[in-house]
C-alpha cells in the first residue's frame, strides 16, 4: 500500500482537536466550527488550543492560498515530495452569516436583486420572508458561491501550472445545500432537493471519461469510491457502509446501482426517533417519528412535482408502504439504525434509545 501525505485544511466540524484524534492527517490547518468568514481562526499542527491563528482574510481565499502553498511545497516545508498526497480543502462558505462576503463578489451582481435571481415557484416573497431573511439574503449567498468557485479555480490552475493535473484526481462536492426560502425553509436539515441534492464532480484527465450520471450516490460512498479509484479497493474495510462506485466513474460495467438513497435526521440524544426516508429516482419519502405522536408521512413525486410543493402521502399509502418495505427497511438494517416506522408511546420508559 503506498504511503500518502494526508493534509486537511479549512472547516472541520469540531473545536480544537487533539493530535491523537486527527484521523491520521499529518498536516493540520483546521477552521473549526466558528463562522467568522472574514476573520477566521485556525489551529495548525502545533497551535495550542487557547491561542489559535487569527487571519484577516476571507476564509476561502486564505484556504486557497494555503492549498497552493502546499502544492508548491517550497523548501519541502509541507510534505514529502517523493510520496503522493491526498489534500482535503474544506471551505465553510457558502454558509451563514451570508453578509460576511467581500464586496467584490457582491459587486458582480450589482445590477440584480435577490428576488430577480431567485425565481423558484416554491419561494413566496411575502412579508415573513423579507423580514426573516433580509433583502440581500439570496444575493449574498450567490456571491459566496461565486467567490468559492473562483478560489477553487485558483487551486486547479496551480495544479496545471505545476504539471500535476494529469496525475491528480480532483473531487468537488458539498455536505449539503440551502433552501434559501424554498418551501418556507431557510437552510438545511430538511428533505427538500435544494438541501439534499448537492454537486458531486470528479476530474482525472485521461482516467475518467467525460460524462453525466444519475447514479444515486451518497456521502458514505465517497471513501470507498476514492480507495477504488486509487487502486486500493481490496483494502476497503468490511465495516464501511458505503459502496465503491469506481467502475462506474471509470466507464466500466460491474457496479450494482442503488435504487434509492437513505435520508436520516436524528435529534441530539435521540437515535431512535426523528426523521428517516429514502430518495428514489422518482420519489422522496420521509417519515417523522415523535414521542407520543402519530407518525407523519411526506411523499413527493419529483417527476410531476419537481419543486416538491405537494405532499401526496395520504392518498398513496400503498406506495408509501412499498417504499418502506423495499427501500427504507433495508437501509435501516444495513446501517444498523434502530429507528423503525412505529409510534413511540408518550410514557415510554426511555424514548431516547
Model-flagged regions — what are they?
Residues 1-9:
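His/Cys-centered metal/cofactor-coordination and adjacent catalytic loops
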Residues 2-3, 53, 242:
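Catalytic-site signature of metal-activated, phosphate-bearing donor transferases
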Residues 2-3, 93-95, 268-269:
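Short histidine/acidic/glycine/proline-rich micro-motifs that form metal-
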Residues 9-16, 23-32, 176-182, 208, ...:
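C-terminal cap/loop subdomain of S1 sulfatases and analogous C-terminal strand-loop tails that border
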Residues 32-61, 68-220, 228-239, 287-294, ...:
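Active-site-proximal cap/lid insertion segments
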Residues 223, 309, 328:
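Generic structural marker for isolated residues within well-ordered, non-membrane alpha-helices
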Residues 313:
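Segments surrounding the PLD/"HKD" phosphodiesterase catalytic module and close analogs
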Residues 323-328, 332:
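Short amphipathic alpha-helical coiled-coil/interface segments
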Amino acid at each position: 500500500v503506498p504511503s500518502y501525505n494526508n493534509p486537511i485544511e479549512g472547516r472541520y466540524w469540531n473545536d480544537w482537536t487533539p493530535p491523537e484524534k486527527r484521523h491520521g492527517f499529518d498536516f493540520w490547518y483546521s477552521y473549526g466550527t466558528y463562522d467568522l468568514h472574514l476573520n477566521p481562526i485556525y489551529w495548525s499542527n502545533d497551535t495550542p488550543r487557547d491561542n489559535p491563528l487569527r487571519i484577516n482574510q476571507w476564509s476561502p481565499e486564505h484556504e486557497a492560498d494555503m492549498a497552493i502553498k502546499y502544492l508548491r511545497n517550497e523548501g519541502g516545508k509541507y510534505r514529502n515530495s517523493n510520496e503522493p498526497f491526498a489534500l482535503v480543502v474544506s471551505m465553510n462558505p457558502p454558509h451563514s452569516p451570508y453578509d460576511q462576503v467581500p464586496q467584490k463578489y457582491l459587486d458582480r451582481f450589482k445590477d440584480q436583486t435577490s428576488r430577480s435571481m431567485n425565481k423558484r415557484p416554491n419561494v413566496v416573497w411575502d412579508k415573513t420572508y423579507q423580514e426573516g431573511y433580509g433583502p440581500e439574503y439570496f444575493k449574498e449567498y450567490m456571491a459566496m458561491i461565486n467567490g468559492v468557485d473562483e478560489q477553487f479555480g485558483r487551486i486547479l490552475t496551480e495544479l496545471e501550472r505545476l504539471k500535476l493535473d494529469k496525475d491528480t484526481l480532483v473531487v468537488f462536492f458539498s455536505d449539503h445545500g440551502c433552501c434559501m426560502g424554498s418551501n418556507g425553509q431557510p437552510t438545511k436539515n430538511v428533505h427538500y432537493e435544494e438541501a439534499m441534492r448537492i454537486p458531486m464532480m470528479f476530474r482525472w484527465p485521461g482516467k475518467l471519461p467525460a460524462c453525466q450520471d444519475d447514479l444515486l450516490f451518497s456521502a458514505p460512498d465517497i471513501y470507498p469510491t476514492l480507495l477504488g479509484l486509487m487502486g486500493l479497493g481490496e483494502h476497503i474495510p468490511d465495516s464501511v457502509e458505503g459502496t465503491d462506485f469506481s467502475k462506474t466513474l471509470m466507464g466500466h460495467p460491474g457496479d450494482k446501482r442503488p435504487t434509492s438513497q437513505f435520508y436520516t435526521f436524528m435529534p441530539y440524544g435521540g437515535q431512535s426517533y426523528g426523521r428517516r426516508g429514502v430518495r428514489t429516482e422518482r420519489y422522496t419519502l420521509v417519515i417523522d417519528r415523535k414521542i407520543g405522536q402519530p407518525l407523519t408521512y411526506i411523499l413527493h413525486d419529483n417527476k410531476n412535482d419537481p419543486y416538491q410543493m405537494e405532499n401526496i402521502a395520504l392518498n398513496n399509502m400503498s406506495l408509501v408502504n412499498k417504499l418502506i418495505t423495499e427501500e427504507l427497511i433495508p437501509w435501516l438494517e444495513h446501517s444498523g439504525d434502530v429507528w423503525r416506522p412505529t409510534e413511540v408511546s408518550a410514557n415510554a420508559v426511555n424514548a431516547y434509545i
